[in-house]
Amino acid sequence: HFFWGLEDIIAVFTDLWGSSGVTKNVAGLFPNDADGNAWGHPELGLPKPLSEMGYNLVHPDHYQPLSDDFSAQINAYKEAGCEIVTGVMIPPDFGTFWSQAAQQGFNPKVVTIGKALLFPSFVNSLGDRGNGLTSEIWWTPDHPFSSSLTGTKAKELGNDYVSSTGRKWNQGLGFQHALFEVTADVIKRCSDLDDVSAVMASISSTNLSTMVGQVNWSNGPVKNVSKTPLVSGQWQKGNDG
């Protein structure tokens, strides 16, 4: 596994909020699913570290995925004076919440949502209300990385994808490429591909500079995890929409 962790989400989200100058009342939106239960866990999720940093997390209850009514949550956020909204949502749930927030006069100054805002197609579907939303950023063509297989730089990979597909690049592109890099590197170094132990030894000894950064399982937080960089970013309307 090479990716970032929830601790990185907390770090980049709070860094973004700290630079915004808004009050520390945060509306929390956590679904009753694996991601929502992890993010909303009182000890291991967002509540404890946010409280330690002086944030007041307003979280009435976990909502059911594909809910069609967020009125109870919106009323609680309005009463608490929440100026920040955060959580981890699938696109349909955020679309429903964001539409109802507008209808009910809830206008937070900062909206930082995990998962739902990763892809441009969904953000574009929100129209003008997609402008200014913020989220975690796994990878972009502006990241200072290149392919260990081809030498292609992140900028070139993004441009090639756009020109060949006619679609905008997305954050998963770099990781999809990196999977092939790691696979090729493991195969190249493995002493016997028919021996499970040899394959595992090759994987665990990986130390490779990839399209998403360094993949090295010898220095991760646990043996099967290699951390990759995470930043936050804001969606802004460009000349191409």
Residue ranges of each PLM-predicted region?
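Hydrophobic alpha-helical segments within soluble ligand-binding/sensing domains
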Residues: 1-24, 69-71, 94, 118-121, ...
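An alpha-beta-alpha
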Residues: 1-65, 84
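Periplasmic-binding protein-like
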Residues: 25-30, 81-91, 97, 108-113, ...
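Extracytoplasmic "Venus flytrap"
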Residues: 29-41, 92, 144-147, 168-175
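Hydrophobic alpha-helical
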Residues: 68-69, 84-104, 179-183
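Extracellular/periplasmic periplasmic-binding protein-like sensory domains
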Residues: 101-177, 189
